[in-house]
């Protein structure tokens, strides 16, 4: 399933290249190994499995669902991408040209319109 929040955007074709992953989203710079879910692709069967078998008890520092899912999925050995692959899919805190999409870049990049104009 594709999660596409209001502050997300697609910049070019290619989203189908990332369907192999159980979860992929933009890399979260200050939380190693975690991905943001604002623009993400998730395996719904695995999301359901995690919710039904692993009760959510909150996280010590970050309690958002994307942090919970990516931490739990890494712990359980699901198929998750590395940072370079995440950046090819979507960017957020660290902008890299060539990404298929973005999430919430206006929060982290003052001149985000200039970055997006590079795709026109």
Q: Where on the chain are the PLM-derived regions?
A:
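Active-site acidic Asp-centered loop
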Residues: 4-5
């Amino acid at each position: 399933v594709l999660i596409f929040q209001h502050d997300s955007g697609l910049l070019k074709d290619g989203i189908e290249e990332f369907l192999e992953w159980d979860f992929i989203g933009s890399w979260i710079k200050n939380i190693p190994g975690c991905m943001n879910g604002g623009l993400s692709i998730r395996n719904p069967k695995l999301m359901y499995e995690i919710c039904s078998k692993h009760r959510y008890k909150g996280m010590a520092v970050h309690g958002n669902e994307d942090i919970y899912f990516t931490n739990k999925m890494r712990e359980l050995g699901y198929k998750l991408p590395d940072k370079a692959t995440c950046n090819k899919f979507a960017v957020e805190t660290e902008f890299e040209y060539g990404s298929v999409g973005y999430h919430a870049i206006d929060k982290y990049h003052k001149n985000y319109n200039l970055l997006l104009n590079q795709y026109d």
